[in-house]
Amino acid sequence: MSQRRIRRFAASMITAAALMFSLSATAKPDELVIATTFSPEATAHIISSWQQQPGAVRIRTINRTSAALERLLDTPALEDVDLVVTSSPMLLQHLQEHDRLAELPDLPEVSRRLVPLRLRDNAAAVAFSGYGILVNKRRMAENNLPVPASWDSLTDSRYQGLLLMSSPSRSDTYHLMVESLLQQRGWDEGWALLLNVSGNLATISSRSFGVADKIKAGLGGAAPVIDNYAWLLLGDPELAFNYLPDSATSPTFVAISRHSLNKDKARAFIRFLLSEQGQNVLADSSTGKYPVTPLPQGNPREPVRRRLLNSPHQMDENLVLKRQRMVQQLFDTAITFRLTESIDAWRALYTAEARVKRPLPHIRALLTAMPVSAQESADPAYYSRFDDNRKAEEEYIRWQQFFREQQRKAIAELEKVR
């Protein structure tokens, strides 16, 4: 077994033990247990509003990453969970494939249309979000930099050491953000842009909401984030948020555990979220989301809600679900695991371009090449390899060798620049 797989196995065992401990108390008939990928801050207002309803029961939440919840819900602990609240269709697909979700009939069309076709029998969409760039204006001013407003602007060499991201393997929010970029720009151009941006990263955060918190703390200057984490922080005058011009939508899904002993109360909670009152709660700035139903006429957020909902840049979620493991591992191999080397290579390139006062496209091409072609990326025969551990490991090794060789060639070419 490789060292990477040993570390991954050990981490999963530790996480599973911690999660089991968090559910050690037996589920109670007078409470709902919600497993969610959202932060406590993102769900606090929703839960508070629900508990003011007549006959409402107390809610207990388990806030974890999608990967951690996937491991948790594959154990007998699932029997203590009533609802799953997440923006991750990947998590819901995993639960559905393992027969972990109850059916949800008779949902309104405004909810159903935002749910991927294969999940429509088991999940409701109650709200949605968009993607943009969160900026610490103080950090920008200190460096005399413009506020970035698009993916392309994040490739500017002046942002070296100021950008933050998470990775698709650590955050399904970032997985969907990355997939949105790859599908809109095309496989090759999308990866070239991501690799270019990686040269400006300060670090890769382990949690998506951790990225927004780090920007607020001034540990970074700008980051692509989902809007609900940004809106929760925008009371700070030092922060600004702008939607990406080609932002896709990211629905908030709710599903009921097949093993829930409180299904009637769980359904009542979903009915509340889809009611007029519940939609108003979800539209409140303290949740940072947009409701699936229209906002009142004159509400300043309605034009943005409508633009995001009707964006032509929506994702092929079936493709996202099919090639999930491949994209996650490719991002980590290309960027996460070699971030230091990537930063050094791009810094050397920027220095060389500044010295000769012209771009060096042949070296940029070396630093942005990928070991997986656009054709392979959409080929089931290729991405299905990652369902087989042995075949997947062979690909990871090939990718590592590819990036090492590209780096070697780039350095050799930089040494020739005069």
Q: What are these model-derived regions, one by one?
A:
Residues 44, 80, 87-205, 210-219:
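Extracytoplasmic ligand-binding site segments that recognize negatively charged/polar headgroups
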Residues 64-66, 85-90, 108, 207-208, ...:
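Beta->alpha turn/N-cap motifs
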Residues 90-94, 216, 220-238:
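A ligand-binding cleft/hinge motif common to bilobed small-molecule-binding domains
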Residues 342-418:
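C-terminal non-catalytic accessory extensions
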Residues 12-22:
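Bacterial N-terminal signal peptides
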Residues 257, 262-265, 270-318:
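Mature extracytoplasmic/periplasmic domains
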Residues 134-139, 249-263, 281-282:
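A bilobed periplasmic-binding-protein/Venus flytrap-type ligand-binding module shared by bacterial periplasmic
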Residues 28-93:
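Early extracytoplasmic/lumenal segment of secretory-pathway proteins
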